[in-house]
Amino acid sequence: MAKYTGPSCRLCRREGGKLFLKGEKCFSDKCPVSIRAYAPGQHGQRRGRVSEYGGQLREKQKIRRIYGVLEGQFRRYFQRASQARGVTGELLLRFLELRLDNVAYRLGFGASRAEARQVVRHGHILVNGRRVDIPSYQVRAGDVVSVAEAARTHIRIAASVEATAGRGFPEWVSMDTTELKATIKAVPVREDMAPDLNEQVVVELYSK
């Protein structure tokens, strides 16, 4: 599946809720989902009945778009989760949550996951003191994630960290906003992740 390059806000409206793809705009009154809470297009306000398969597909697309991964990547995460010991749906979300680009976003090193991914790719993020520029890199409990010295003066990073601090950092990280450094205290459990995601229907979709 090709990468989507259209307006991000249309994806949020298509999925019927905020996917937090546009940084601070998503938390403001200017968010299109708050203004027009219906699907885009001529017939967007007339949502038809959705079949069981259609509902499963929509939830899969929603999760995939939130974390910004392509279909092939998403399926590989599911296969890995289904082969591991534990609850498949929860493991799937955990693998996505522990991607380096998502961790960078959770720490405020990017205003959105797309921006955090760019920060990672540009080599501005260190893991245990070593530069890592792979967005899909899996962070582990005990890892220390920080901003490289040369990037600590970037205004956008500083502003994003401040905004994220105001909303609160995840319980599974210990963040030092002065040093722009965080320790991963533990892997996130289901209660630490978005409560409005229904990962079980994705498991059912891929299990057919």
From Swiss-Prot:
One of the Pfam families matching this protein, by short name: Ribosomal_S4
Keyword flag Signal: no
Residue ranges annotated for the S4 RNA-binding domain, each copy included: 98-159
Keyword Acetylation belongs to the record: no
Keywords, comma-separated and alphabetical: Ribonucleoprotein, Ribosomal protein, RNA-binding, rRNA-binding
Gene3D superfamilies per the UniProt record, alphabetical: Ribosomal Protein S4 Delta 41, Chain A, domain 1, RNA-binding S4 domain
One of the GO BP terms on file: ribosomal small subunit biogenesis
Role this protein plays: One of the primary rRNA binding proteins, it binds directly to 16S rRNA where it nucleates assembly of the body of the 30S subunit.
Family matches, as HAMAP family: Ribosomal_uS4_B (MF_01306_B)
Descriptive protein name: Small ribosomal subunit protein uS4
